[in-house]
Regions:
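Mid-to-C-terminal Rossmann-like scaffold of FAD/NAD(P)H-dependent oxidoreductases
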Residues: 1, 7-8, 21, 274-385, ...
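Beta1-alpha1 glycine-rich phosphate/pyrophosphate-binding loop at the start
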Residues: 1-73, 112, 161-183, 318, ...
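A Rossmann-like FAD-binding core segment of flavoenzymes
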Residues: 25-27, 74-92, 97-98, 165-259, ...
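Rossmann-like dinucleotide-binding cores of NAD(P)H-dependent redox enzymes
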Residues: 59, 146, 154-210, 290-293, ...
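Short hydrophobic core segments
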Residues: 98-108, 226-234, 298, 375
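Glycine-rich dinucleotide-binding loop and its adjacent helix/turn
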Residues: 107-166, 201, 257-259, 471-481
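FAD-site-proximal beta/loop scaffold in flavoenzymes
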Residues: 120-143, 214-217, 223-300, 394, ...
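Rhodanese-like catalytic fold shared by cysteine-dependent sulfurtransferases
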Residues: 406-417, 421-453, 459-492, 496-542
Length: 542
């Protein structure tokens, strides 16, 4: 039996390796269109800046290793130009024809290249292959001073950081009003503040119009000089072969597969960035170009080829990215997605230290949590300096097992002062959600502050700044100053992070107040959003 694998990236290599471990007699051939196989694509931005200083480290496996260890033949520079499903053959480089019993289609995705004037400038690159990175390093070695990154996704943000690491004047341009689309504006604002503090010229709500000589011209008319530019505005599934041979393509442009990763042809499987998968939260088809899911899908294909009933159980979209000193992580749906899908939801923000506050060097982490009135988990996001991905991973695991906010509340997690608090942030998110569901607290948010009575409940002398037009009534005095708090108006209480205002709101709710809210995330989140907002306003004045 012969199995052909088209594409030697994460999904293809994973499928081939698993298949060999299950069957030592099968003939397995990987057909790779480029001269590289199984490279660490996700590390390319760090290789470009010499944070990863060895090219060899970027090669996860070699053709020799595949042959010596797994007895898998890898053919480089072997572009499949046609699939003949009826005859079960493929054509390589428009010349050689080879037959298959099973075919695994993992061609990946192509970077989006806008059709604008000057886009073929020799110093404009995408970051998809090791060859791309080599070319980028070659330009950087020629005393490059100005870098422009078009696109504020994960790769764009990572490339901007690594250009700054090399000492380049760096501009990042993003067409949307925020970077990092998988998270919401509040989490993105924290990351945007960090990028600006580190020296990135961040231009949001603006896009590439054309390239004029050695300048990037934006839709706004701004002109940015560059020695090197990166296109990181997204990817599209590579489906040319699939379309030409008549495989079913989904509404989002990816190859349609079932839960066994089988295409509309029972002899052809597909995985990785080229396929559409089912979203864990919404149940709708989605495109998730991530290495983790691609590797799992490859393994599932191998199992099914060998008769092991293995299914792909939807995609949660768990992701993490380094933004200078910050870490941003997320799982599930964000608020934008929930609004678009019509899913009803509740939300809360908390800011908690990375470990026990009394132990040295604790740093704050901002969390956003989305859930339903029934306690179902819809999504979580976090941004901080330490332990961020650890908490999101725990929530992702609870979600994967169809757990609820009550499972978060009850989770027994590791604790010692250098690592966490007795009530871990995962526990605290569950507790906050439970309080909201039970009506013990009504959360208010940044956009709710207008036309509300604002009460700063922090103790006098314990703070340097407050929210404009607020009055200060400390929690310790609130029972004796009820006459200063109106019952006929919306009242929003706030403190540093939201805990004291929750306590104060409980007092008022039990004193007959019904229109009392606690500012979720407190004034610390308010300051994060204000800093970002003011930075954007300053740009409009330039």
């Amino acid at each position: 039996m012969r199995t052909l694998v088209i594409g030697g990236g994460a999904a293809g290599a994973s499928a081939a390796a698993r298949l060999r471990r299950l069957d030592d007699n099968m003939e397995i051939i990987i057909l790779e269109a480029t001269d590289e196989i199984s490279i660490a694509n996700c590390g390319l931005p760090y290789y470009c800046s010499n944070v990863i200083n060895s090219r060899q480290k970027m090669i996860v496996s070699s053709t020799k290793r595949f042959k010596d260890l797994l007895n898998i033949e890898v053919r480089l520079n072997s572009k499949v130009t046609k699939i003949n499903r009826k005859e079960k053959t493929v054509v390589i480089n428009n010349s050689e024809t080879i037959n298959y019993d099973k075919l695994i289609l993992t061609p990946g995705a192509n970077p989006v290249i806008p059709n604008v004037k000057g886009i073929n400038h020799p110093n404009i690159f995408t970051v998809r292959t090791l060859r791309n990175a080599d070319d980028i390093k070659s330009v950087l070695a020629r005393d490059a001073k100005n870098a422009v990154v078009i696109g504020g996704g994960f790769i764009g943000v990572e490339m901007a950081e690594n250009f700054v690491h090399l000492g380049l004047n760096t501009t990042l341009v993003e067409l949307s009003s925020q970077i990092l689309a998988p998270v919401d504006t509040e989490i993105a604002a924290h990351a945007q503040n960090e990028m600006r503090r580190k020296g990135v010229n961040l231009l949001l709500s603006d896009g590439l119009k054309e390239v004029d000589g050695e300048e990037i011209v934006l839709n706004s008319g701004k002109r940015i000089p560059f020695d090197i530019a990166i296109l990181a505005i997204g990817v599209r599934p590579e489906t040319t072969l699939a379309k030409e041979c008549g495989l079913k393509i989904g509404a989002l442009g990816g190859v349609k597969v079932d839960k066994n990763m089988r295409t509309s042809d029972k002899h052809i499987f597909a995985a990785g960035d080229s396929v559409e998968v089912e979203d864990f939260v919404s149940g709708k088809d989605t495109l998730i170009p991530l290495a983790g899911p691609a590797n799992r899908q490859g393994r599932i294909i191998a199992d099914n080829i060998k008769g092991i009933k293995s299914t792909y159980k939807k995609t949660q979209g768990s992701a993490v990215v380094k933004v200078f000193d910050l870490t941003v992580a997320n799982v599930g749906n964000n608020e934008k997605q929930l609004l678009k899908s019509g899913q009803k939801y509740l939300k809360t923000f908390i800011i908690k230290p990375s470990h026990a506050g009394y132990y040295p060097d604790a740093t704050p982490t901002l969390y956003k949590f989305l859930f339903t009135q029934k306690g179902e988990i819809l999504g979580a996001q976090a941004c901080g300096y330490e332990g961020v991905e650890k908490r999101i991973d725990v929530i992702a695991t609870i979600m994967r097992n169809n757990g609820t906010i009550y499972d978060m509340l009850d989770s027994e997690l590791c604790y010692a002062p250098p690592y966490s608090s007795a009530k871990d942030p995962v526990n605290m998110l569950g507790m906050h959600a439970e309080n909201i569901i039970n009506g013990f607290v009504k959360p208010a948010f940044y956009n709710d502050l207008k036309d509300s009575v604002l009460v700063d409940i922090r103790e006098q002398g314990s703070f340097d700044s407050t929210i404009e037009a607020s009055v200060n009534i400390p929690t310790s005095q609130i029972r004796g100053r009820l006459n200063e708090i109106p019952k006929d108006k919306k009242v929003i209480l706030f403190c540093n992070t939201g805990f004291q205002s929750y306590v104060a709101s409980r007092i008022l709710l039990q004193k007959g107040y019904t229109n009392v809210y606690s500012l979720s995330g407190g004034i610390e989140l308010y300051h994060i959003l204000k800093e970002n907002e003011n930075a954007e306003k300053e740009l409009t004045l330039v």
